[in-house]
Amino acid sequence: MSLAPVQVIGVLNVTDNSFSDGGRYLDPDDAVQHGLAMVAEGAAIVDVGGESTRPGAIRTDPRVELSRIVPVVKELAAQGITVSIDTTRADVARAALQSGARIVNDVSGGRADPAMAPLVAEAGVAWVLMHWRLMSAERPYEAPNYRDVVAEVRADLLAGVDQAVAAGVDPGSLVIDPGLGFAKTGQHNWALLNALPELVATGVPILLGASRKRFLGRLLAGADGAVRPPDGRETATAVISALAALHGAWGVRVHDVRASVDALKVVGAWLHAGPQIEKVRCDG
């Protein structure tokens, strides 16, 4: 078994209602400093979002979303950081790209805004297509009745890739994300994680976003049944990051960059020690 190079993507929510850190980085200066700190801890990419996609969140006015993300993206990009823009709106993505972002992370998988595919094709940037089967303007979070969640999510994602390519997007610029927690039950999420090698086998880079999600909190519930809160799910997130790397994921999107980077370093050292030990034995 080998450890594939993994992109650790730091989450930077410039929002007032995200599920784990809403309101913490609304001030642009605070947001930029947090982005810089995540890069110092090992993040390869900073994913900036100005609208929460948590269950039940009210949609943010596009003008507010723009006002939140543009100054942050501009400053981080000016400092040489690879920035991703987390949005479903083409107008917001365009402004972010003009401000220096190089990746569009679209949780709707291109379904929310028909102008997104032409924009990405014209800009020639990377595009993350996430799976969210019931995504709509109202954003229903009820989990669909999948007959085979792995096969159906895989098919939906590949259909999205085909549609993007047909719209002129470079296939080599696409990344797919199974959308853990988006209109999926905990059982669906675990099935998708277990089937990561099958998703990797599609040949399209895979991004996983399990960080701090509720299905981890449920798994780690206390003896009283209380779901563990988001800030108590970092160890579980780091374990998923390490396992994702072992199974060939392209990237992991996390809130606590250091924990996942540390986990990846430990697993990498463990795996790479074997050949070195054999060499020492032979030389001795």
UniProtKB/Swiss-Prot annotation:
It catalyses: (7,8-dihydropterin-6-yl)methyl diphosphate + 4-aminobenzoate = 7,8-dihydropteroate + diphosphate. One of its GO terms (biological process) is folic acid biosynthetic process. It is an enzyme of class 2 (transferase). Keywords: Folate biosynthesis, Magnesium, Metal-binding, Transferase. Is potently inhibited by the sulfone dapsone and the two sulfonamides sulfamethoxazole and sulfamethoxypyridazine, with Kis in the range of 12 to 32 nM. To a lesser extent, is also inhibited by p-aminosalicylate (PAS). Residues 6-265 form the Pterin-binding domain. One of its GO terms (cellular component) is cytosol. PROSITE patterns: DHPS_1, DHPS_2, PTERIN_BINDING. InterPro entries: DHP_synth-like, DHP_synth_dom, Dihydropteroate_synth-like_sf, Pterin-binding_dom. Optimum pH is 9. Its cofactor is Mg(2+). Disulfide bonds: none annotated. SUPFAM superfamilies: Dihydropteroate synthetase-like (SSF51717). (7,8-dihydropterin-6-yl)methyl diphosphate binds at residues 53, 86, 105, 177, 213, 253-255. Its EC number is 2.5.1.15. Signal peptide: none annotated. The keyword Magnesium applies. GO terms for molecular function: dihydropteroate synthase activity; metal ion binding. CDD domains: DHPS (cd00739). Mg(2+) binds at residue 13. Catalyzes the condensation of para-aminobenzoate (pABA) with 6-hydroxymethyl-7,8-dihydropterin diphosphate (DHPt-PP) to form 7,8-dihydropteroate, the immediate precursor of folate derivatives. Homodimer. Belongs to the DHPS family. This is Dihydropteroate synthase. It comes from Mycobacterium leprae (strain TN). The gene is folP1.
